[in-house]
């Protein structure tokens, strides 16, 4: 993975600079955009949306969505005796751990107030309070951290996972736990780690098919 990042360092730099610019542009508009995204009307339809958001957030964390992915991929690797699926499982685990760990370090370090915290909006500095762990979204980071490597390596399995991950990201905003920029930052971090991991798995499969 690190070799892939090094070989594509200019693309990585462009991603980092472009992503930083996007996030900085989003900060002043976060509350406005969050109000537009969230559906909080006292109607039956919105009640169903809120219930779906709660379910996605509950099952979309590391112990839920990610564990299901790891077990499913590992099961296929075992049943099919497939080195490809085994590598894909490892890539999903690494993507989750790398992205999730970085997201948690940033959350504790920046201390951004959650939208529902009733604290002054903004960054308050290092904090262990869950009310100040908004930036970035850990749920989104771990969900996309597992999905992106699989989507790059094996799209038929990865694309449905990306749809679920997108639902998890939406649920974090619908539940008033994160700002839009928190979610987008997590997706960018997942892309940074997930694409190289997925490419490694895909290339290893292509290499194994070459005739001797």
Feature locations, PLM:
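N-terminal transmembrane-helix/juxtamembrane module of multi-pass inner/ER membrane proteins
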Residues: 1-71, 107-129
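Membrane-embedded catalytic cores of phosphoryl/pyrophosphoryl-handling enzymes
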Residues: 2, 119-212
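Interfacial segments of alpha-helical transmembrane regions
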Residues: 12-13, 74-104
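Aromatic-anchored segments of alpha-helical transmembrane domains
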Residues: 20-26, 99-101, 165-176
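Alpha-helical membrane-inserting segments
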Residues: 30, 72, 102, 106, ...
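Membrane-helix interface segments
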Residues: 48, 81-87, 154-159
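Transmembrane helix-loop junctions in multipass membrane proteins, especially transporters and channels
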Residues: 78-85, 108-116, 177-181, 202-207
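Hydrophobic alpha-helical transmembrane segments of integral membrane proteins
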Residues: 90-115, 181-191
């Amino acid at each position: 993975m690190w070799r892939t990042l090094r070989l594509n360092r200019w693309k990585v730099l462009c991603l980092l600079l472009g992503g930083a610019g996007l996030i900085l542009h989003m900060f002043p508009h976060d509350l406005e955009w969050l109000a537009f995204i969230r559906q909080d009307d006292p109607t039956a339809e919105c009640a169903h949306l809120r219930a779906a958001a709660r379910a996605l957030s509950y099952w979309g964390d590391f112990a839920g969505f990610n564990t299901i992915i790891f077990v499913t991929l590992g099961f296929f690797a075992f049943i099919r005796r497939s080195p490809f699926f085994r590598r894909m499982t490892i890539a999903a685990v690494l993507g989750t751990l790398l992205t999730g760990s970085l997201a948690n370090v940033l959350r504790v370090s920046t201390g951004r107030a959650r939208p529902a915290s009733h604290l002054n909006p903004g960054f308050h500095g290092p904090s262990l309070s869950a009310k100040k762990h908004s930036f970035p979204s850990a749920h989104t980071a771990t969900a996309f951290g597992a999905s992106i490597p699989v989507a790059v390596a094996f799209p038929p399995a990865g694309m449905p996972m990306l749809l679920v991950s997108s639902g998890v990201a939406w649920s974090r905003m619908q539940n008033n736990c994160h700002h839009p920029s928190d979610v987008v930052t997590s997706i960018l971090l997942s892309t940074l780690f997930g694409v190289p991991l997925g490419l490694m798995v895909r290339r290893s499969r292509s290499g194994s098919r070459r005739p001797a």
